[in-house]
Curated annotation (Swiss-Prot):
Pathway(s) the chain acts in: Purine metabolism
Originating organism: Synechococcus sp. (strain CC9902)
Protein name according to UniProt: Guanylate kinase
GO-annotated cellular components: cytosol
A Pfam cross-reference name: Guanylate_kin
Record-listed ATP binding positions: G12, P13, S14, G15, V16, G17, K18, G19
Task performed by this protein: Essential for recycling GMP and indirectly, cGMP. (Microbial infection) Catalyzes the phosphorylation of dZMP to dZDP, when the bacterium is infected by a phage that produces the substrate for the synthesis of dZTP (2- amino-2'-deoxyadenosine 5'-triphosphate), which is then used by the phage as a DNA polymerase substrate.
Keywords, alphabetical: ATP-binding, Cytoplasm, Kinase, Nucleotide-binding, Transferase
Amino acid sequence: MAHNGRLTVLTGPSGVGKGTLVKRLLDQHPEIWLSVSATTRQPRAGEEEGVSYFFHPRDTFDALVAAGGLLEWAEFASNCYGTPRDPVEEHLAAGRPVLLEIELEGARQVRTSFPDAFQVFLAPPSFAELERRIRGRGTDTEDAIQRRLARAREELNAQNEFDAVVVNDDLDQALKQLETHMQLQAP
């Protein structure tokens, strides 16, 4: 049984495997509610409004920020991303475990609003492996890869700010560690 109403924040650099790990976690623990972020970026193939993200034009996103409607937000790679506040608070009040998969600046903002949130940093086994994974995606220009790698160095330097660090070397082991940190029992 999950510890009801616990907020867990998962952060890590681009290419570390957050998406894969979260998908496995949700497959095994349907009681977890994964927050859906709002973004100003364009949808990618296969992404659905309200499932993958809430896609907003910049003026709508800025209005959400001004109204206090986002728990956290940041600009990354020329796009804005943020966590809508109301659904997070509603699910926590209903006693559900809530997971935020967000970037470093967002995690720092959540620390202010929800100091009891448990924050987990997902780290690669090495920087070389992270670079291999990012390049292996085949979706970015060399310029974009260099920006992601520079950002990853900054993020890796911040991992001591987190309550726990999980190294994503072996997916099954990383999943077990995340389940433990989230106070979940293996299915």
